[in-house]
């Protein structure tokens, strides 16, 4: 066993079983070595549970079957196992059947501790069972947190060009340089093998990797925290090896090229027995000012987890890719709250000034609209000025109509979103999503592709205030009715930390009357000096606040799962108080700046962005 792998497994044994030094070494020496090829199953869900395994080399995936056999639901990926971690603890304790299946992403080596050997050690160390049970509880907590293992401890990444890529060499150099600022990194291409002393003669068209080359690659992986495999342009033995060895695959496409998957790409990545490694698409554009369009043509027909845009030699976007690979990218979630959402504009400026990167944006209602503006990647000044034009000068809340479908026609809102936020979601420089709900059954919709303005029209269609939006011949309404702070959706993305801005209020509404006054009494109180004045919320405020009530508990629950929750003091502002735009933005900025400074002082993993 290589030194680094030995130390990782030894540390895991000590952590799980609470034994040290010679006892831990003795347990390690008593483990049996197991080799498993990429794509093969270590065991399947429902198999007899009779052993615990420690991963020495490679990477594994945890899969669970749908609860109802034969249902339309597909097996679900729970997470990934990385070197030094263990699998099968529950089975060793209970002796039942496997609650999940374990499949190798790439060729992997494990050490096996069977029940008999475990019981032998338990006699010598009575606390072994309790120590293992505690370790299981901790691991279950880690593994059930959404997104927690998305890019955790990647050891190998394959860069696979989808055609001629004259920019590839420069990109590899910049990517490797950025990674080396963080961890020990080695970049390997077919041209590098001979220079580095690899047994290149061992390469063959066969899928299996010859032993001499396998040992050479293992040594490189042991000496470096991360290996970057650069595949050839096309189907070659080296390209096959790169894909087979990868924990994660980055498909590299030139935005101006033919987006249709080639025959060799389909064969290597999507045929039976192909790798199950996570994959993402990186689309290269000539320069930062190049328009992004037709991304959907690259996404169709490809099974990818996410995609990113790389404009020219942008250091900022190269750094975003690095953060995604290292598991410390930042997702920003913006909640709904009508005019109080202007505070999110200020929070964004505070993040930008503090150097906090934004690698993914998601939001609901007003948060979705502001989030889409942020995803254009034009900076805080652009977002502030265009938000002011849209909501203060555009007056979308003053578009009253005959209240048949709603109080507001929604024409102004539609016109504003069409004008300021054109294009498709998948073409945005920063990945984005927003939330809406189906009117007929309340099912949540996550908008990640298609027309930006249509998605925003849906996420902000507050029932009673604005007419429902039409999406695929279904009526949809404001996402605040089902998920007003979609941190859970962001946790499913490849982000390491989540910053959320919650602009809902906990204010108590108290009145000085026992029965609701009539509309005429309210009007009289406003017009006639000697009449009693009644403090009552307007119909729009009632509609907006009512929409929040149903998800208030969920918002509080979601907020606990954010790494940084920013709650600007905006309760003094009304839900339609667009005239206070600048004051609300300032309130969000001041509060966020203070909270961000505290957060960054405590979490050294927050890496300032590269502009």
Question: Where do the language-model regions lie?
Answer:
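Cyclic nucleotide-binding regulatory domains
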Residues: 15, 35-107
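Cyclic nucleotide-binding regulatory module and flanking cytosolic helices
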Residues: 1-40, 92, 124, 128-129
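Extreme N-terminal, non-catalytic leader segments
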Residues: 109, 115-156, 293, 300-329
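Glycine-rich phosphate-binding P-loop
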Residues: 153-181
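A short, Lys/Arg-enriched amphipathic alpha-helix followed by its capping loop at the start of a domain
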Residues: 171-183, 346-356
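Patatin-like phospholipase
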Residues: 208, 214-215, 220-225, 234-362, ...
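Short beta-strand-centered segment that lines the nucleotide-binding/catalytic pocket of NTP-utilizing
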Residues: 176-196
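Gly/Ala-rich beta-loop-alpha elbow adjacent to hydrolase catalytic centers
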Residues: 363, 367
